[in-house]
């Protein structure tokens, strides 16, 4: 039939590397067979820039939105398509910054795969960014529960990392959690004061802080141990342990040094989630803000520009809608 002919044509044009024709053929195909999940998945892939070996071109706002629309079709027709779930989650969070939509997206995935840990990891990562720590704790408990399917090393590491992130962040904010939608929140004054200070990168921090300390420990242990035959391997081991310990301890220090930047990151997340603004103009014109925006995906930068243009304020009473709580 025409459907299978079109699908063959689409496959051939994709093999030739002709993404536009592939997209055109698949669009024609889904207008004839709206339930063709493979064709929708191909549309979702073709709407995005071609995967590159070197520097990857990132999708624009329009490309991202079109791809997400197609992916919503895919997961509706073929909920077992893991790749579609993962891609949709990445686009919603990293390229659109739509945290509420992403929470719902992963909640739907949980409906189809209740024993899978990935959706929980993703939901926890979103809730941490938005500052909802109590909800994180419940999900983490669920994530490590015996009902969940067994996971491989990579996922086990991600689970450990995400729960560490939660405990670090909630410790840092134990005095008060920053809610950017409250214009009178005391953290805004601190961001205003530090708005010329860009965040310190981990690499620079390790070089300025950890390296000199390690050098000091190394020299000191050489003096104490002397230069017998086994001195060098011993000093090396002391150094290694010292560097690892200092790096771990100093990451908390780095986090508190960069707290104003983490706060402003959250304010940007609030803006992209609500489509409304909460960042004062004096801060939006600052070196801190532009250094954070440089690290964002192009689609997010486009969205923020549109949100700033429409200039609607986030209501002070706004609260993140969390699907898990409305079950």
Spans of features found by a protein language model:
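Canonical positions in the second alpha-helix
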Residues: 28-29, 73-74, 108-109, 142-143
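Structural signature of tandem alpha-helical TPR/SEL1-like repeats
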Residues: 16-24, 51-70, 96-105, 132-138
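Short coil turns that delineate tetratricopeptide repeat
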Residues: 34, 79, 113-114, 148-150
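Alpha-helical segment of the N-proximal tetratricopeptide repeat
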Residues: 1-35, 42, 48-59
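TPR/TPR-like (Sel1-like) alpha-helical repeat modules
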Residues: 62-68, 109-112, 125-151, 164, ...
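Transmembrane alpha-helical hairpins and terminal membrane-anchor modules
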Residues: 196-270
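TPR alpha-solenoid repeat register
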Residues: 39, 84, 119, 152-155
